[in-house]
């Protein structure tokens, strides 16, 4: 199931095969459009190896010493950005896509084999790997504070170990951008704020998902045409200044 527990401000996004079409929440308004057109989705890019090497070597250690232990990990932050009083949660939708498509391709296995640090039986285990745990998360756009759980992972230890890096990468970046956007929108006192950050973003992925996060933070539009197409958000522009 995929219960939306709004009064608890928590989503259960587990059981990857049971997750329905993703939805966006902008300024409290939920849209019926899918998170992205299928051929533009990040699902087209397998992100399973978006992890630190030590996560995989630790997984092999657990594999060599079998355990059925289920662990609980909470993702939280210690200090508000820019010494502000709050932050804004963002990144959940990409986390959902990442979990849904979590698997090792033959190319992934071949690459890991080439590193010559993983045993054949462990690599064979990875061929059939999929996430079976539970994930609970605060909805995007929610005001959040230090040291409160934003995402809770309940899963077998190897599965929880693997997803740590990507989960934090997605959550931290997009929540930071959404928070900054929210502070700018608040300072504007009702004037509309547009997001024009693409040319200064740290690469295409940061530009695309940063623009989406800025919309969650309250911006009324973005200059990023690809973000507009992917997520059906307003695109806006002025003219050259040179």
Residue locations for each model-derived region?
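Short, positively charged and aromatic/hydrophobic N-terminal segments
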Residues: 2-7, 11-12, 18-21, 25-27, ...
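Ordered alpha/beta subdomains of enzyme catalytic regions
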Residues: 26, 32-242
